[in-house]
Amino acid sequence: MIKEYYDDNISPELLKLRAKMMKLLSEDDKLNQIVQLVGEDVLPNDQRILIEMAKVLKKGFLQQNAMHEVDSYVPLDKQYKMLQVIDNLYDSAEKAVKKQIALTKIKNDDLFEEVIKIKYNIPNEDYDEKFDELNKKIKDYFLKLTENNDQE
């Protein structure tokens, strides 16, 4: 019944995206146990970017400020679009790691911070265009990063 509601009113992809983010958090939990024992530096870059993306998901999506005028209530459609942006960043970062791009270049603090703050910086109405702009910004950043890496 709830799946039908999501399919009809939000997107058929919502539950798949939710499952992907749950898996990300589960893997992050396992990796954090290793990190506590031996430190993050011993992890390969694909696992380190997973930890970074879990931080983005936790801070940018799961943490809620009930006293904030925008964050106290977030429409389900906006939540879905927020998850899409986080997923876009995660997929782009994973592809960059596979191309052997340095983690310090992949983890652009300004871009990651902008994604974390989307729930505050994008209002709860008329948000489609802003999410499209942010997704384009992510795409453009990683495209440029990949092109620069290919030239080196």
PLM regions: where:
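Conserved catalytic/coupling modules of large nucleotide/cofactor-utilizing molecular machines
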Residues: 1-152
